[in-house]
């Protein structure tokens, strides 16, 4: 598969060769924001119902009618509108104007959902040849226009330098965006698996193996090497995911208490339906975080690079917690105080001191950092819990005695 792109000769379409046959993809929009004919792309990716594919697979913000794109181009202001515009300059017929064109995210969406065997190869072609060629020629045209404008309008040297720096900045940003878009196009496809497997005998004993793989067919075979055929491993639940090894490790940490004491690869005691619910929940919520980041890269990354951002102000922890309703209640305080006292006592024990003495001010400061309760209220509760009455009071803590002093 390859692509033939010569924008100097024609900016109306790009040609993709698959199995020796040429396929044209009509273009529209601009070289900075190219649009592709949805029908042409669907035909290449072997979608049977073009209308349904464009309606269900591509979000509304990623597709436009050709007539809308042409109208936007004609209404645009600036020197770029003539020489960086893509598509035909001929008047549109009514049917041509209704044709749906998709932008870059829309193109990725159709590729991602396609069942065509060469979908990934076509995706690489888009990244490595089609889009770079459009953008490279667009950058060349922009530089030509800038030079002509400088000659015609006698732009001052300072303005020229600013324009040059702006172009360099835009090119660097484009490289960064392309890098992120390429990364998510790979990671956005769930190509790995989390599975639960067992045998007939193990199932009766509620013993299950949870694992990860990118090759379901071969993995189960490894488990059955040397096992009797009548009690071989089989899959009883599988699901696709983004990063199976990370999820597998996360599951192991969460379910460590259920591992079989004689075989750490097996999980025991949990009813199968409950185990499925637990593992499914872990996978879905792990994938949701990746979906969120991928969505941010596709929908907010460019704007996030460009938008102005002020320096965030410092916050008052206690006020912030109170505004969020995160008040530490009495039970929390009654747990925190003994914990902090034990930590302080252990530190003193390590120093081999003859007498264990804890400074009141230091103790309250440590507790204040962990709560939004006033130091006065903390000190009142410390006295209630320890029986403190003065700096001479000896407080008993198991085998150790200590004092809290001013």
Swiss-Prot record:
Residues 4-138 form the Bro-N domain. Residues 141-177, 343-372 form a coiled coil. PROSITE patterns: BRO_N (PS51750). Pfam families: Bro-N (PF02498), T5orf172 (PF10544). The keyword Coiled coil applies. Keywords: Coiled coil. It comes from the Viruses. Belongs to the IIV-6 201R/289L family. This is Putative Bro-N domain-containing protein 019R. It comes from Invertebrate iridescent virus 3. The lineage of its organism: Viruses, Varidnaviria, Bamfordvirae, Nucleocytoviricota, Megaviricetes.
């Amino acid at each position: 598969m390859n692509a033939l792109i010569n924008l100097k000769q024609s900016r109306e379409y790009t040609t993709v060769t698959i199995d020796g046959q040429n396929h044209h993809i009509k273009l529209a929009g601009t070289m900075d924001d190219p649009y592709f004919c949805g029908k042409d792309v669907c035909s290449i990716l072997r979608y049977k119902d073009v209308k349904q594919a464009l309606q269900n697979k591509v979000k509304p913000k990623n597709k436009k009618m050709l007539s809308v794109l042409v109208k936007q181009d004609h209404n645009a202001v600036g020197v770029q509108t003539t020489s960086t515009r893509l598509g035909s300059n001929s008047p549109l017929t009514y049917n041509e104007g209704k044709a749906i064109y998709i932008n870059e995210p829309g193109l990725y969406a159709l590729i991602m959902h396609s069942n065509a065997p060469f979908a990934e190869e076509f995706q690489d072609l888009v990244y490595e040849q089609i889009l770079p060629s459009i953008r490279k020629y667009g950058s060349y045209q922009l530089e030509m226009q800038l030079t002509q404008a400088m000659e015609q309008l006698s732009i001052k040297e300072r303005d020229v330098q600013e324009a040059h720096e702006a172009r360099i900045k835009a090119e660097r940003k484009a490289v960064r965006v392309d890098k992120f878009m390429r990364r998510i196009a790979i990671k956005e496809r769930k190509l790995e698996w989390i599975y639960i497997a067992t045998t007939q005998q193990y199932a009766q004993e509620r013993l299950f193996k949870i694992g990860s793989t990118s090759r379901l067919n071969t993995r189960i075979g490894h488990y059955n090497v040397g096992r009797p055929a009548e009690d071989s491993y089989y899959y009883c639940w599988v699901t696709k995911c983004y990063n199976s090894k990370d999820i597998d490790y996360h599951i192991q940490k969460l379910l460590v208490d259920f591992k079989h004491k004689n075989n750490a690869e097996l999980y025991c005691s949990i009813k199968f339906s409950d185990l499925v619910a637990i593992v499914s929940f872990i996978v879905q919520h792990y994938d949701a975080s990746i979906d969120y980041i991928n969505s941010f890269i596709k929908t907010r990354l460019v704007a996030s690079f460009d938008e102005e951002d002020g320096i965030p102000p410092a916050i008052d922890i206690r006020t912030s917690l109170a505004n969020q309703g995160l008040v530490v209640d009495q039970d929390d305080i009654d747990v925190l105080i003994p914990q902090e006292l034990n930590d302080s006592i252990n530190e003193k024990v390590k120093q081999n001191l003859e007498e264990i003495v804890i400074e009141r001010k230091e103790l309250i400061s440590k507790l204040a950092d962990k709560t939004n309760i006033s130091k006065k209220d903390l000190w009142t509760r410390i006295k209630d819990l320890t029986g403190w009455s003065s700096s001479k009071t000896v407080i008993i803590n198991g085998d150790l005695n200590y004092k809290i002093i001013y």
